[in-house]
Amino acid sequence: MKTLLTFIIAMICVLHGFAQKSEPLDTAQFSSPEEALLGTLLYRMAEKNENALHRSITGKVVDENNSPLDFVNVVLLRADSTYIAGAVTDENGVFQFNEGQDNPKFVKVSSIGYTNQTINIPPTGNIGIIILNPESVMLGEVVVKSNRPVTAIKGDALVTNVAGSQLEHAGTANDVLTQVPMVLGRDGNFEVFGKGSPAIYINGREVQDLTQLSQLNSVDIKNVEVITNPGAKYDASVKSVIRIRTKRPQGDGFSGTLRAQGVMQKYFRTVDQANFKFRTGGLELFGNFGYIGGKFQSSNRVDMLTQSSTVWNQFLTQDGSMRTNEFFGKAGFSYMFNDSHSIGAYYSNGFTKQKSEHKGISCVLADGQPYDNLSMYGRSNNNTLPKHHANLYYNGEVGTLGIDFNMDYMWRKNRNSMFNDETSDTQDNSLVNSLGVSRSRMLAEKLVFSYPFWKGGIEFGEEYTSSRFSSEYNTDATLVGNADSRVDENNIAGFVEIGQTFGQFNLGVGLRYEHVKFEYLENGQKKEDQSKTYNNLFPSLSLSTMIKNVQLSMSYTHKTQRPSYADLDGTVDYINRFTLEGGNPFLKPEKIHSVELMGAWRQFFGQMTYTYKKDPIMNTTYPYADDAEVKLITMANFPKIQNLQAFVGAQFKVGVWQPKVNVGIMKQWLTIDYADGRKSLNNPIGLMQFQNAIHLPYDIWLNVDMQWMSSGNDDNMKQTSSSYLNAKLYKAFFNNQFSITLEANDIFNKSNRDATLLNKDVTIHKFNTTNNRTFMLTLQYTFNSSRDRYRGQGAGTNEMNRF
C-alpha cells in the first residue's frame, strides 16, 4: 500500500512538472529498494519530459507530387496562436527550429499558390512530411487552380523555379537564362538589367568557362537566383550574381551527353560537345570536350567628328570576317566521403586560332571641304595557346561548422599579329605591321566558414589573389612606337556576414576588407605615379520580411569597379592616321553605393535600385602627344554619375499558354564637357519583354519571345532603339534521351544598337550593320542522365574576367 501511494504521488508530481530536477537523484531518501527503483524511473520520466520542452522541431514540406518545396514559410505558434519564431524551408524542403523555443504548440506552413496548413507539434519535435496542395478558388461555376509563382524572393535574391515549370524544356542553361527576369543576352553573353555582367555560379562553383552553361541541361536545373546587390562575401567589384542550382544526382555508372549545333547567320558555324561521367559510390570522374568552328561576319559604319584647329569629318565604311577554330577540354574528379565531406579537382586547357580580314573606305573632310579618300585593307592572326586552368576544392562540415575551400591557378598566352595597308588619294600611303604578345597568370584561394549563431548564422572567411598581366607590342609605325608594360596585383580580403531572424524580419549585416597592391612597370622599370596601394572597407546591409502574401526586401552595398587590365595597358594601337587607341595606367577604381528595394506578390514582382558612382570610368578622347590633329581614344575617370533603375514583371498561365511580361527603365544623371560647353546626358532607356511558352500536342514546346529597348543615354553614349523577335520549337524523344531544337533568332534583324560616343573634342557615331538574323538546329543525345557532384566554388574568377 505504501509503494502504491508513493507511485501515485510521484506520478502526480511528474504530470504537473514538480518532479523535474536539475541535480542527480539521491536514492538514500527512499526507505526500501522498491521505492528507490520506482523513484528513479519516475525521475527519468520527468527528466525526459523536461528535455522535450527544449527539443528541436523539424519537418519536411513537399507538394502533391512529393517534390520538396523550398522557400516555404514556417511559423512556430503557442497554444493561443501567438507568434514565437519563423523559418524558411531549404532546397530539400526541410525546416528546423533550434532548442529553447518558448512552449510551442503548432507550426503554420504557408506558400503562395498553396493551401495553408496548421499542424500540432508531436512530443518528439519531428513533424515528418507535410504535404501542401495547390490552392483552388471557386468563381461562379469555374474552379481556378493557383500555381506556385515561377519567380519569388528569398532574402536579397530573385528566385526563378525551373523544376516543375515549362523552363525544364528550355534546352540548356543558356536557354533558361534567356527566360529569367532581369537577365539579358544569350549564348553565355549575359548581363543583368542595369547591373552589367554577372558572376555566375553552378551549385556554388563559380563558372570559369561560359561554355559550361551549354553543357548543363535545363531538365537538371532546380532554380536560378539573381542577386542584384550582392553582399560582403562576394568580391567588391561584383555588382550582380546568378546562382544556378541543380537537382540532386542519382544513380551510378557511365553517363554522357553528345550535342551538335549548326548555326547559319551569313556564314555557317558549328558548336560540338561531348560530356562524360563515371560514377561509383562516392567517386565521380568526368571529362568534357568541345569544338567551335566557323566563320563570322561583321560590318559597320563609323562617322567621326574631330574638333581641333581644323574640323575633321571622317566617314568610314568597313566590312570584315573572321574564321575561328577553338578546341577545349576538361577532366577531373570529385569524391564524397559522406554527406559531410567531399573533395575534387579538375584541369582544363584549350587553344583558339582566329584569322580575320577587313576592307574599308574612308572619306575625309577638312572644314567641310574634301581632303582625302582612303582605301584600307587589314588582316590579323590571333592565337591563344595555352589556356591552362586548374581548380582544387574541399567542402565539408565538422559538427555544425561548415568549411569551403577553393584554389585556382590560371596561365595563358595570346599572340596577335596585324597588317594594315592604307592607300591615299592625296597623301602618302601607309603600311603598318605590328605584333602584340600578352601573358597573364593568376593564383587565387578562398576559404569560407559558416556556423549557427544566435538566431541565425554567421559566415566568415578570407580570399587571396595574386595576378600578373604583361604586354609586349612592336610596330613599324613611327607615330606609335614599341611598348613593353606589366601589371602586378595582389589582393588580400577578409569578410564576415551575419544573418539573424527577429520575428517576421530577417536581418543581414556584412563587412569586407580588401588590401590591394598594384604595381605598373614599363620596360622593366616600376612607375611610382601609376603604382597604387588601396585599403578599403565595404559594408553591406539587408532586411527582408513577409507581410501576408507580400515579400519585401531592402539592401545597401558599397562596391568598387577596378579598371580591367586592357584599360590600364599603356600600349597604343594604330587605327588610322587620325585615330589611335590605348589604355590609361592612371585610372582609379570607381566607388559605388547602391540601395535596392524588392517586392513580390503572387505572380507579380518588382525591383528598384538607386546607385551613386564616384570616379566612374568611361571612354574619352585626348590629343595624342604634340599633334592636336591626331586623337587618342582611351578611358578616364569622370567626377560622378547617378542612376535610378526599376524593373517589374509578371507571369500567367492560361491553358497551354504561359506568358510572361517584363518592363524596366534606367535613368542616369550625367553632365560632361562637350564642344564649347556642357551637355546633359539624362535620357532614360526603357525595356519591354513579352515571352510566351505554348505546350502543343505531342509534347512539343513553342517559344515566341519579343523584346524592345528604347533609345537613351548610357554613360557618355547615346544608344538608338532596338528590338527582336525569336521563335523556337523543342521536342524530346525516347523518355527525354534525344531532343531536337529549331530556332530562329532576330527574325526581322532589328537587334543592332547604334551608338554615339560624346566627348569634348571627338564625337563618334557607330552604326552596326551586321546581319544578326540567325537560324539554328540543335541535336542532343543523353544516356544514363545524371547530375554533377562537383562542389568547387572557384576563386579569383573576377581576376580572370579582367584578363
Segments predicted by a language model, with ranges:
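Short, acidic, small-residue-rich periplasmic hinge/interaction motif at the N-terminus
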Residues: L25-N49, V75-L77, K108-Y114, N126-Q166, ...
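Outer-membrane beta-barrel signature, preferentially recognizing the C-terminal barrel domain
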Residues: R486-E489, D529-K532, T560-K614, L632-Q645, ...
